[in-house]
Each structure stands twice: as C-alpha cells, then as structure tokens.
C-alpha cells in the first residue's frame, strides 16, 4: 500500500468509560442521553470489532461514534486540515488528518483513508453517507486490505449504485418501475433527443448520484441542455462519476422510501416507510415516519418489494429503497441508496432499532436479532434538517460563518439532536451546511409535530443565517398539519418564495406588547441604577410609572409599518408582569422579560408563548416569534416626531449587476467585457457546498466588466459581472 502523508493523534482514555460500566441489555439511550433510540439493547458478551474508522465528518461521524462508544468499540476519526477542531475529531479516540479542505483532496482520497486504516490498526470502516459510502472500488480495496466495510458488499453497491444498471435489476425483481431510457446519455444533443422521445417533463440525473445532487428537471430543450451540463459537472464534483441518465418526471408525486436491514445469513427486514416529500432542489427538508398517506396493506407491498430487490442483489447491510408515489397510491422504484440514510433517526424512533448498531453487528458477521413479525411501529417521528441557509433565497441558499451562540433544545420531551457542531464551530464553504438533524418522537403525529414546534422555538442559533424560520412555518401550516403534501409542497404553499410567517392582528399585538414591555423594563432598570443612592421608594417607583412609546411592526417586506401608541404599566411594581395598551386594546404579559436571555418563556393573556431576542439596538428590538425574526421599533413619542425629517434611502437598481448570492467558488464565466447579453442569459456558474448555481442577467445589455475568473473564491454580495 502506498504511504500517504498523515498525522495521527491519540486521545487517551476516551470512549470506553461509558461502556465499561454499561449493563448487558440496557438500552443505549439510558447512557447516551436522548441521542440514540433502541429497545434491543447490547449483548456485551457478543464478539465485536475492537476499533473502527469513520470515513466521514460532521454529524454522521458523531452519530456513529456514539453507538460504537456505547458498544465498547474504539473509534478513529479522519479530518481535513480545516476540520482539525471539529466535534467528531474531539469525540473519537484517535484522529488522522487526510488532506486539505476540498473534499477531493481529503475525504474523497480513498488512498489516504486506506493508509489511515493501516496506520491505526482499525479493523473496519464505517463510511457514513456521501463521500465514499457508495464507492465500489473503495469497498473492494478495503476487503483486499483485510478490513471490513461497514456497509453492503461491493457487488451490491455496484449493482445498485449505478442507476442505469439498478433499473434493470429492479425490473427483473418485479419492482414497479418509472418509464425512462435505460442507457447512458453521452452528450447534450442525446439528452435532448431522449427527452423528446420520453416526453417532457423529464428528470436528468447522475447515474452515481444521490442526496439531491446532480439532478435537474427539464421541461423543454433549453432546460435539457442546461440541466445536462450542470448536473454532469455537479456529479463529477460530488461523486467522481459524471454518467447521466434520463427518465420520465412524475409531476407532483410523493417521495416515500422503505428502510431495509439485511445480514450475511440471508435474512432481510423492512423497517417501515419514511415520508420525504418536503424538498427543495431535490433535497429533503422535513421527513416523517411513518407516512400518513400509506395504509397497512400498501406498507406491506412496498416493504416486500424493497426486500425482493435487496435479496436480488445479495444485500447485507442497511439500505433504503426509494419510491415515487402518485395520487392514486401507485408506487414506482426510484433508486436504492446502499448506505445509511440521513433520515435514519426517525426509523429508529418508531422501531426501537439502532440501525448503526445493527450495521456494526452485521458487518462483523452476526445475524439480525429479530424477525419481520417482531418489527414494531411505535408512535410517530419527525426530522427537521436545520441548515446554515437563507430560507428567503430560493428556500435556502447556503450561508457561512461561526456559531457565536448555540444551544440545542434537548430539554424538550421527545427530542433528539444529531449534530456535529458546537458553539464556536465554523460553517465553511467546503462542506454541506447541515447544522443538526432535529428529531421529535411522540405517541401520535400531532404530539410529535407539537414537540417539533416547541423544539424549533427553543433552538438558539446565532452567528449564521439558518432555515428555522421556514421549518417553523411549515410545521404550523394547515396542509402540512393534515398530511396533504407532495414534492411540489414548497412552490405551491410559497409560490413567491418563503417570505416569513404572516402574523394575524392578534399575533402582531403579541410581538408589539413583548417588545414594548422589554423596553419598558430596560428603562425601569436604568432608572433604578441612576437613582440607586436615593431612597428605596424611588426603586419601587421605577416599576410603578407608565412608560409611553410609539411602536411599529412591518408585516410585509417593503410595506410601511403602522405606528401604534403604546403604554406599558407594570402590575403591582413587578418587573415580570405588565399591562400593555396598544391603541384601544389591553394585553397582559408576564414571564421572562429579560433582554439578556436567549429564550424568553412568556404568557400573553394566559397563553404560553416562546420567543427569542435575536437583535437589539437603540429604538429597535428584533423578536423571533414562530421562527421568523420581526424588527419592532419602540421609540419615545418625542423621538418619533423627529423621524419625519429623516430622508429614506433610495433603492439601488441591481439589474445592472450580477451579485454572488452566497460564498462559493467560480466554476464557469461565460461572458467577457463588450459582449451583448439578453435578460435571463447564464453569465456565471458558481459552486458552494457541492451545489452548482447558475447566475443570469437581470436585463438585456452590454457587459461592462467581469470581475472574477474561474477558480476564484467569492463572498456573498460580491459584484461578479457589471452591465452598462
């Protein structure tokens, strides 16, 4: 084996302390908190691996480490140079640096991962998901090196990882299929021809793809050409394999998948379905298990077809068979993911089976501990993918930055947080911007959903833009609450894009009352401080006077906010209870009215409400209410009089410039100074978090300047191209 430059860091006495005192048969969640759900328990007399290496990063690496630690297995983490202080590195017993920040120079370097296995003496490798998890050559090389691949055998990965070949196998296994072209698409012209033959719309996707990358929907020839080119580039970047296929796009389906678990003794189980229809850019946003759309008989048929396919390829690990389901409950095979799925926690919640634990057991050679008849379906679970993304831009353009404040809502009943970050962690342009998989479990769908609302309201994230506003709005939205969802849910519910939560008049009063009460309390405290050397009666007087403000709350972007005359009077001199008069209405507010607290639990007219203060400056408080930040102006009456003399800033015409919508790297520049371009023409292609983004001209005109070159790294808001 070729030697690769690597550095090994051993962490003494970490990881085994928990397992040393663990009792056989005790569920993992008693020792590891609420991160892991299993009722199967652990047999500590059963042979197992001594040490495994996790060929991944972030939350999935942490997730695998938790189960391995509970089983008494030592762990080795790998990392890039920018990940040296990451949480998964700190959690592991040993860590090996495998290269530079770009994935192609580190996490996708199979040779360096193999060298790390040899250097550390790891007996097996868990690949997580993404990266090398579905790389047949890597799995085969591991086998040659005498190490186990904690996943399916390399032949099964090859058969199912190639989307073209997998469709042929699925057809032979009598799995319901989507119409399409079985061969590889050679170029843009062929893509257009095949698309016409199938009939638009079509789905253009990478043969080796997954996770929503390398996929585009095309409704015409132009989109087919652009979709082929962008998806091919994306596939090469993400998977090192740019082969493409085309199939009929089923408009407005549900995306429902079946978890399978198989061993090396011919046993195969289906662990119930997951509903994954809420998506943007073909990536899942919120998942649930089970699906409210799937009756028991349909569940059985989907499960049996999934197992048929798994057995047809000799599958021997955890995997997921994905289906598209139409409105008549007809289901069609989409693909099989030969790895641990991102959303596996919700299946663990409803079955009590730790899928990672069983992957470790099966890879070692043990049979599955239960039969199909013993697979339970207990309650309901949801997973919200919390991303460092701006939900107001295309339902989520990636964001970067450092987490200046970070508190997970683990105190909420039924909550599980699978994350790979902590306060102070950096979200960079090199990797997926996932912050956490927020999971809730309840006795039924309504309880699990209510717990998700509470968890999102209590989730504290500062320093990066995140998608909690969108997640929180979805979980309270009527269609979602009733289970009326398809893959078109987001564009149908938010046709103009996500604009934030819309507040009713009553909810507007809540936000104004809260902000005004906070401001009044701040002034009362200031008066106490200024008068601290005077008689005590002046201290009480600070909370006995009436504070008058003019408050305003913009309900929609661009609209001039309505101003309200507000009076705040603290009840019985209490700092935590006040009556707020807004025009002719009176609101009673009590509870945590402290500006310094990240989360405020209050009661408004007897109703419990959770809010957060995410920004404050003179005359303005930004209140996070139902996930959406609202900037509330709270000004003394005199100050408002002077505002009329302040000129409003003129709006800038941005149609003459192309701005970077996010931090990223420039992949293509398609114009030069002097070129004539038409409105909507593609000018620049940039990549961020392994996703390709095409940037277009906002108007017809001549190119005045091109400020970037291919390979350049740019920040959000940089001017890339200028038009005359």
Swiss-Prot record:
It is found in: Mitochondrion matrix. Coiled coil: none annotated. Mn(2+) 2 binds at residues 335, 337. The modification N6-biotinyllysine is found at residue 690. GO terms for molecular function: ATP binding; metal ion binding; propionyl-CoA carboxylase activity. Residues 167-364 form the ATP-grasp domain. One of its GO terms (cellular component) is mitochondrial matrix. The active site is at residue 339. Mg(2+) 2 binds at residues 335, 337. Biotin binds at residue 395. Residues 48-495 form the Biotin carboxylation domain. Signal peptide: none annotated. The keyword Ribonucleoprotein does not apply. Mn(2+) 1 binds at residues 322, 335. Binds 2 magnesium or manganese ions per subunit. It comes from the Eukaryota. The holoenzyme is a dodecamer composed of 6 alpha subunits and 6 beta subunits. Interacts with sir-2.2 and sir-2.3. Consists of an N-terminal biotin carboxylation/carboxylase (BC) domain that catalyzes the transient carboxylation of the biotin covalently attached to the C-terminal biotinyl-binding/biotin carboxyl carrier (BCC) domain. This is one of the 2 subunits of the biotin-dependent propionyl-CoA carboxylase (PCC), a mitochondrial enzyme involved in the catabolism of odd chain fatty acids, branched-chain amino acids isoleucine, threonine, methionine, and valine and other metabolites. Propionyl-CoA carboxylase catalyzes the carboxylation of propionyl-CoA/propanoyl-CoA to D-methylmalonyl-CoA/(S)-methylmalonyl-CoA. This is Propionyl-CoA carboxylase alpha chain, mitochondrial. It comes from Caenorhabditis elegans. The lineage of its organism: Eukaryota, Metazoa, Ecdysozoa, Nematoda, Chromadorea.
């Amino acid at each position: 084996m070729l030697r690769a430059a690597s550095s090994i860091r051993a962490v003494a006495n970490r990881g085994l302390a928990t397992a040393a005192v663990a009792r056989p048969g005790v569920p993992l969640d008693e020792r590891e908190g609420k991160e892991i759900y299993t009722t199967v328990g652990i047999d500590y007399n059963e042979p197992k691996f001594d040490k495994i290496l996790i060929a991944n990063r972030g939350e999935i690496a942490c997730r695998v480490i938790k189960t391995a630690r509970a089983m008494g297995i030592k762990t080795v983490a790998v990392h890039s140079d920018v990940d040296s202080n990451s949480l998964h590195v700190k959690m592991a017993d040993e860590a090996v640096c495998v290269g530079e920040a770009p994935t192609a120079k580190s996490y996708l370097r199979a040779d360096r991962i193999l060298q790390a296995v040899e250097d550390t003496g790891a007996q097996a490798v868990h690949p997580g998901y993404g990266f090398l998890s579905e790389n047949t050559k890597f799995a085969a090389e591991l086998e040659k090196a005498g190490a186990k691949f904690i996943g399916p055998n390399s032949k099964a990965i090859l058969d199912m990882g190639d989307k073209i070949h997998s469709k042929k196998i699925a057809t032979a296994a009598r799995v319901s299929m989507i119409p399409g072209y079985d061969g590889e698409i050679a170029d843009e012209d062929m893509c257009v021809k095949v698309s016409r033959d199938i009939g638009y719309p079509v789905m253009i996707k990478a043969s080796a793809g997954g996770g929503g990358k390398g996929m585009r929907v095309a409704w015409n020839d132009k989109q087919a050409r652009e979709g082929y080119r962008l998806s091919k580039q994306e596939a090469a970047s993400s998977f090192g394999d740019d082969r493409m296929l085309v199939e009929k796009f089923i408009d407005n389906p549900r995306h429902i998948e079946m978890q399978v678990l198989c061993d090396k003794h011919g046993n195969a189980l289906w662990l119930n379905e997951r509903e994954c229809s809420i998506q943007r850019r073909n990536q899942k946003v919120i998942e649930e298990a089970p699906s409210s759309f799937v009756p028991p008989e349909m569940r059985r048929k989907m499960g049996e077809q999934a197992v048929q396919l798994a057995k047809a390829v000799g599958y021997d690990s955890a995997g997921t068979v994905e289906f598209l389901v139409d409105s008549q409950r007809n289901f069609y095979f989409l693909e099989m993911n030969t790895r641990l799925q991102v959303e596996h926690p919700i299946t663990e919640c409803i079955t009590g089976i730790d899928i990672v634990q069983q992957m470790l057991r099966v890879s070692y050679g043990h049979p599955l501990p239960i039969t199909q008849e013993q697979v339970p379906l207990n309650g309901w679970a949801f997973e919200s993918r919390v991303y460092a993304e701006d939900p107001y831009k295309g339902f989520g353009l990636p964001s970067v930055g450092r987490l200046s404040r970070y508190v997970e809502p683990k105190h909420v009943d039924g909550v599980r947080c699978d994350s790979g970050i902590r306060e102070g962690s950096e979200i960079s342009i090199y990797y997926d911007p996932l912050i956490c998989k927020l999971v809730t479990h309840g006795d039924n769908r309504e309880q699990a959903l209510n717990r998700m609302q509470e968890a999102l309201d209590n989730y504290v994230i500062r320093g990066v833009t995140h998608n909690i506003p969108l997640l929180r709005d979805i979980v309270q939205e009527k269609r979602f609450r009733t289970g009326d969802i398809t893959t078109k849910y987001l564009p149908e519910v938010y046709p103009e894009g996500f604009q934030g939560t819309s507040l009713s008049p009553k909810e507007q009063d809540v936000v104004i009352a809260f902000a005004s009460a906070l401001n009044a309390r701040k002034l009362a405290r200031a008066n106490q401080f200024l008068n601290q050397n005077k008689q005590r009666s002046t201290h009480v007087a600070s909370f006995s006077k009436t504070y008058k403000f003019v408050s305003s709350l913009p309900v929609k972007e661009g609209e001039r906010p309505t101003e309200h005359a507000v009076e705040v009077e603290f009840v019985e001199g209490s700092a935590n209870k006040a009556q707020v008069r807004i025009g002719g209405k009176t609101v009673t507010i009590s509870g945590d009215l402290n500006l310094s607290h990240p989360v405020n639990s209050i009661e408004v007219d007897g109703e419990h409400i959770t809010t957060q203060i995410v920004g404050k400056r003179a005359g303005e408080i930004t209140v996070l209410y139902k996930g959406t930040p609202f900037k509330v102006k709270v000004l003394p009456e005199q100050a408002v009089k002077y505002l009329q003399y302040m000129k409003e800033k003129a709006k800038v015409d941005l149609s003459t410039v192309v701005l970077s919508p996010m931090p990223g790297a420039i992949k293509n520049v398609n114009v030069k100074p002097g070129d004539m371009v038409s409105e909507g023409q593609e000018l620049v292609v940039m990549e961020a978090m392994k996703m390709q983004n095409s940037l277009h001209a906002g108007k017809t005109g001549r190119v005045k300047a091109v400020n970037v070159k291919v390979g350049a790294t740019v920040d959000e808001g940089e001017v890339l191209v200028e038009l005359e």
